[in-house]
Regions:
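N-terminal small-domain helix-loop-helix segment of the aminotransferase-like
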Residues: 2-89
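Hydrophobic residues at beta-strand termini and immediately following loops
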Residues: 87, 130-132
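Glycine-rich helix-loop-beta junction characteristic of Rossmann-like nucleotide cofactor-binding loops
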Residues: 75-78, 98-102
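Active-site phosphate-binding strand-loop segment of PLP-dependent enzymes
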Residues: 136-174
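Conserved PLP-anchoring active-site segment centered on the Schiff-base-forming lysine
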Residues: 100-122
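Generic structural signal for small/hydrophobic residues in well-ordered secondary structure
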Residues: 23-26, 71, 84, 108, ...
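Short acidic capping loops at alpha-helix termini that bridge into adjacent secondary structure
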Residues: 80-84, 104-107, 154
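A short helix-loop-beta submotif of the ANL/AMP-binding
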Residues: 124-130
Length: 174
């Protein structure tokens, strides 16, 4: 499998630590553990006492049952914890979804510009990727008629991320 270099990460690795003003960051400023505990109104000594007694195991493959139960509660429908898999962030979730759905010879349509993984991973998996270009004049909103021309009978996936990275455009309903 030939996975292309992740260009934005390579650029950030090269320049972000020495930049006086980092205008390339894609994340919010990180919280310190103490700040997170304060926001959640959790007493630090109690938390760290429990943490010190926590046995370090490999853990449940789909994520801890307690966490999956809490995630399930967020969505008031008939889904169960069996429908929830906890991943190591969006990159891990994207990888699992694309690796599961896409293979050699498949066709994928992906909006562009977008997060590089969303088109380069299907290409690395052997799929032909058709790009639905998001245009500034359209507010970076997808053109449904253009999408219709790109989707073929053998299209395996349509990859859209919202809010779009890097444009920030939020695709609504209708």
């Amino acid at each position: 499998m030939d996975i292309k270099a992740f260009e934005v990460e390579e650029w950030m690795n090269r320049y972000e630590d020495d930049a006086k003003y980092n205008i390339a960051e894609t994340c919010v400023e990180s919280l310190k553990v103490g700040e997170l505990l304060d926001i959640a109104s959790i007493e630090r000594n109690e938390f760290f006492g429990k943490l010190a007694e926590t046995k370090l195991t490999y853990g449940a493959i789909p994520g801890s049952l307690g966490l999956r139960e809490e995630i399930t509660k967020l969505y008031h429908n008939k889904k169960t914890t069996e429908n929830v898999i906890v991943t190591n962030g969006g990159i891990g979730a994207n990888f699992l979804a694309l690796f599961t759905l896409v293979g050699p010879g498949d066709e994928v349509v992906a909006v562009y510009p977008t997060y590089q993984q969303l088109y380069s991973l299907p290409e690395a998996l052997g799929a032909k990727v058709r790009r639905l270009r998001l245009e500034p004049g359209d507010g970076y909103m997808p053109d449904i008629n253009k999408l219709r021309t790109l989707v073929k009978s053998n299209t395996k996936a349509i990859v859209i991320n919202t809010p779009n990275n890097p444009t920030g455009a939020c695709f609504g309903e209708g």
